[in-house]
């Protein structure tokens, strides 16, 4: 029995807690001890009710990593309820979405975590769920764009968020639809001027970018890498100056 307990404590990285007063340790440490207690019974299935509640980010990640390892190496089925949909998306093999007293959706994460599905499930009408980042975004600031952002490769994301926090409507472009900046710009920008991936920027797309940019009070340019396909972005930057 002592060997089983030692192995369980080791599995959840709680060896140093064996002689501690349970009431004196942190919430994250308590969760690990309780999990070790369950493992001692050598179950085939573990059911957990919101195991990450009241835990800080470090302990949430640590606990979920332990559960993943248990599922893979010890072949224990882990069933748990979570309100953090970003974590559920990253850690789960199958998802059950409960709305009221009804199972609204069931499937693999990539089948369930879609923008329209999450919007309907939680009745979101003042923001967005981004399935690419697994994040919740506040609503875009409406109105005529005051700032035009020229960016690429993730360099625009902190700028988009800052403008959104300052309630400044903005436009973004020219972005390819497979650019990571596009994934957030489409949710937060008033208008996004886009081009299809791996194509040279068309006259129509370039003209629209110039038109929108000229109406803005300011232009923000990040360190945009320019290549053969997007070389007209360089021309757009020169016009901005």
Model-based region annotation:
Residues 1-18:
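Conserved ABC ATPase "signature" region
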Residues 21-25, 29:
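Conserved ABC ATPase signature
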Residues 42:
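Conserved catalytic motifs of ABC-family nucleotide-binding domains
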Residues 46-50:
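Catalytic Walker B motif of ABC-type/P-loop ATPase nucleotide-binding domains
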Residues 61-74:
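Helical segment within the ABC ATPase nucleotide-binding domain
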Residues 96, 100-111:
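Conserved switch/coupling elements of ABC/ABC-like ATPase nucleotide-binding domains
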Residues 123-201, 221-222, 227-230, 241:
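ABC ATPase nucleotide-binding domains
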């Amino acid at each position: 029995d002592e060997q089983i307990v030692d192995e369980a404590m080791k599995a959840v990285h709680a060896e140093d807690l064996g002689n501690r007063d349970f009431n004196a340790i942190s919430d994250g440490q308590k969760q690990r001890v309780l999990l070790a207690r369950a493992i001692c019974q050598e179950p085939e299935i573990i059911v957990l009710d919101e195991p990450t509640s009241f835990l800080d980010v470090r302990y949430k990640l640590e606990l979920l990593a332990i559960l993943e390892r248990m599922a893979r190496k010890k072949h224990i089925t882990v069933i748990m309820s979570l309100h953090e949909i970003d974590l559920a998306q990253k850690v789960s093999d199958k998802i059950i979405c409960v709305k009221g007293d009804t199972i609204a959706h069931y499937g693999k994460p990539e089948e369930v975590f879609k923008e329209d599905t999450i919007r309907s499930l939680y009745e979101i009408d003042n923001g967005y769920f981004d399935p690419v980042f697994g994040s919740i975004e506040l609503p875009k600031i409406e109105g005529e764009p005051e700032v035009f952002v020229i960016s690429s490769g993730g360099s625009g994301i902190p700028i988009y968020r800052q403008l959104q926090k300052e309630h400044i409507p903005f436009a973004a472009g020219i972005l390819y639809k497979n650019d990571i900046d596009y994934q957030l710009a489409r949710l937060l920008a008033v208008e996004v001027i886009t081009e299809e991936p791996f194509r040279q920027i068309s006259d129509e797309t370039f003209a629209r970018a110039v038109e929108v940019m000229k109406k803005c009070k300011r232009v923000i340019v990040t360190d945009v890498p320019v290549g053969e396909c997007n070389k007209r972005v360089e021309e757009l930057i020169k016009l901005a100056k």
